[in-house]
Amino acid sequence: MSHEKSFLVSGDSYPPPNPGYPGGPQPSMAPYPGAPYPQAPFQPSPYGQPGYPQGPSPYPQGGYPQGPYPPGGYPQGPYPPGGYPQGPYPPGGYPQGPYPQSPFPPNPYGQPQAFPAQDPGSPHHGNYHEEGPPSYYDNQDFPATNWDDKSIRQAFIRKVFLVLTLQLSVTLSTVAVFTFVGEVKGFVRENVWTYYVSYAIFFVSLIVLSCCGDFRRKHPWNLVALSILTVSLSYMVGMIASFYNTEAVIMAVGITTTVCFTVVIFSMQTRYDFTSCVGVLLVSVVVLILFAILCIFIRSRVLEIVYASLGALLFTCFLAVDTQLLLGNKQLSLSPEEYVFAALNLYTDIINIFLYILTIIGRAKE
């Protein structure tokens, strides 16, 4: 349908169409025939509809006379480049009058003004999140800074040393019975197979407590497994001590006690961090195992004394490391829940030191 037919109304005078888009040429067109009013040239838009005027309008300032409409009509004055006019309307225009302006002062960058200050008690105040409930980590039984609390640390140390004292008491009693009671000493010497049974029980208990973290923290099963390990290892130590001279056993117990107390006190007082040497100690254990295999094939009293001396020195270093892990004031530390694991480490260190010292004394007296 052509542009002219879209504006035809039967028996009525029609106003001229609006001009086209700005920026393009304004072709002249002949006025409509028979029209009593002058027509303005226009350029059709791409969609067949008249565009919005921008720039000076060619129409008369008084608007289009529409018969019975008031002379004021709807003015179609020139539009400013910025958009719609904001000035006051003529008397015959809209009854609202001039549009109200924004209460904020004009801002050249178009940014709104800052919001007025709010009441601190309002939920939208800036300090609302600072006054909220504490975080989840503040309500834990063992927060991230639990080692800073001396009471927790001291309670953990007391529990570990209490368990260790009970273990050493059982072992010392077993060694005393196997050393001073002749009937028991004769029985264990004749039944060597009991040593291998106790060694198998000890090995299984050691693997369970060392590798199963959830199990060794589960009460009371952790204490049950630790008790089984203590009894089996005590039987092994007592059986080994029964093959040595009574004087050698007493000397080994005394030297072990002195060495352990000295190392523990030194580890508590020194500033040197032994926990940073764990990797070196693990490599040394591998070397010591290879040395032990060599001693099996090469039967030499001197070689066995050297092997026992290196083993005693190595587990003395392990005792220092485990003591500092217990104290928790170095690079590495144990959790307060690991009291069974801490007691196990200290106990095995002391027993190995005793066995190596007993080997040194026994081989030296031969």
UniProtKB/Swiss-Prot annotation:
GO CC, one annotated term: Golgi apparatus
Bilayer topology term: Multi-pass membrane protein
Region annotation (Disordered) ranges: 1-141
Location in the cell: Membrane
Keywords per UniProt: Membrane, Transmembrane, Transmembrane helix
Function: Potential apoptotic regulator.
Protein name from the UniProt record: Protein lifeguard 1
Annotated organism of origin: Bos taurus
Gene that specifies this protein: GRINA
